[in-house]
Amino acid sequence: MIQRTDSYGYVEFIRGKYSVHNYQYIKNIVDEMTMCEKHNILTKTFDDLWSSLWGEYSGIQYRGEEQVSKNKFLHMKNGVEMSSGVKYNLETLISSSTTSWETAEWGFPKGRRNHQEKDLDCGFREFEEETGYNKLTLKQIHNVIPYEEIFIGSNIKSYKNKYYLSYMSRDTIQKNEYQKSEVKNMKWLSYKECMDIIRPYNVEKKNIITSVNNTLHNFMLCDVL
């Protein structure tokens, strides 16, 4: 499994993927953040937060949304008055959060497809980029359909991730560095360790790993020459 460098909630917040008047949604993504991320939001400037998140890509790939995101951040810092008359700002928003995550979420290597890229090719490419293992060392298990993780995000929209089951030799060597900009840590874990490390509210992800575990215990894996 891999651990993201930044929590999903933090990335959504810095990118300004919300309406400042949708308090409940903003509260939901704040509750997904780590304690360190919450502290940084209160103590650092938006420019510092933006540069830290995107690194060398800060002025290129997401330039179009930077100013919009900054305006929302400053609006909340100065205070927002809801239509109900209730007011809040960044400080009250963070202080009302009841979560205390120490690390960002753990999950599986995945990502978006490139233009005209097939699902399977995307899966192999993302695995190589995010783990450092050569994708050619992977052996796909062909007679198992992809596992689909369908879930409702904090924005109440439906999303679907598709995972392909593959395996590699025990003595496979990780030759390349994984994407440090997106991946903070990586571990080979047992089924129990996976279940323990996945956040409790990520029920769909827990269901995926349980289904994989059941498949591996109920069926024999055979090499086909």
Regions from the language model: what does each represent?
Residues 1-80:
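Internal, charge-rich low-complexity segments
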Residues 8-9, 53-56, 61-216, 220-225:
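Unchanged
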